[in-house]
A protein has these predicted regions:
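Conserved acetyl-CoA-binding loop-helix of GNAT-fold acetyltransferases
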Residues: 86-89, 95-108, 131, 135
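Conserved GNAT-fold acetyl-CoA-binding loop/helix
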Residues: 22-42
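A short beta-loop-alpha structural element at the N-terminal edge
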Residues: 2-16
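Glycine-rich phosphate/pyrophosphate-binding loop shared by adenosine-nucleotide-utilizing enzymes
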Residues: 1, 60-65, 82
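A short helix-loop-beta-strand connector motif used in the catalytic cores of GNAT acetyltransferases and
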Residues: 44-55, 83
Length: 150
């Protein structure tokens, strides 16, 4: 398996994997449309300064990806932060170190960019993801709350 930066030629496959991520997360969030299909989401972000799209290939097939970006509010934040926005590993490749490898590479990108931390959001009932992030030294520091209206 090979980890590398995404190229424009990878954009359609990354959209497919993001679609799968949304479908997976729909089981934890009733407001997610489990039949939604992502199109043209990543093409413009590949190579964009402050954005990182990483992927893992196995025999030429993209089987996992991570998308993250740098976030800064001058004057409000003492240092910029990195946001880990999306992480997906094909089911057959889970629990084989792919997610850890992607996060490690993103951590290096973030550190080289001078950020003070990486932040992410995870659905509170997604125990598998919570366990992964805790194992990789992420800690709960904020709580996001929602109020259902309908």
């Amino acid at each position: 398996m090979k980890l590398r930066d995404a190229t424009p030629a990878d954009a359609a496959r990354l959209d497919e994997l993001l679609t799968k991520l949304i479908h997976d997360e729909a089981q934890y969030d009733s407001n997610l449309n489990g039949s939604y299909v992502v199109t043209d989401n990543y093409l413009d972000r590949i190579g964009l300064e402050g954005h990182k799209l990483l992927l893992i290939e196995d025999e030429g097939e993209i089987i996992a990806f991570l998308y993250g970006f740098l976030y800064e509010i001058p004057g409000m934040l003492a240092k910029p932060i990195a946001i880990l926005d999306a992480l997906y590993v094909e089911e057959a490749y889970r629990r084989k170190g792919c997610a850890a490898q992607l996060i490690s590479a993103f951590k290096s990108f973030a550190a080289e960019s001078g950020v003070c931390r990486i932040e992410l959001k995870v659905l509170s009932n997604n125990e598998t993801a919570l366990h992964l992030y805790e194992k990789l030294s992420f800690k709960e520091t904020k709580k996001y709350m929602t109020m259902e209206l309908a």
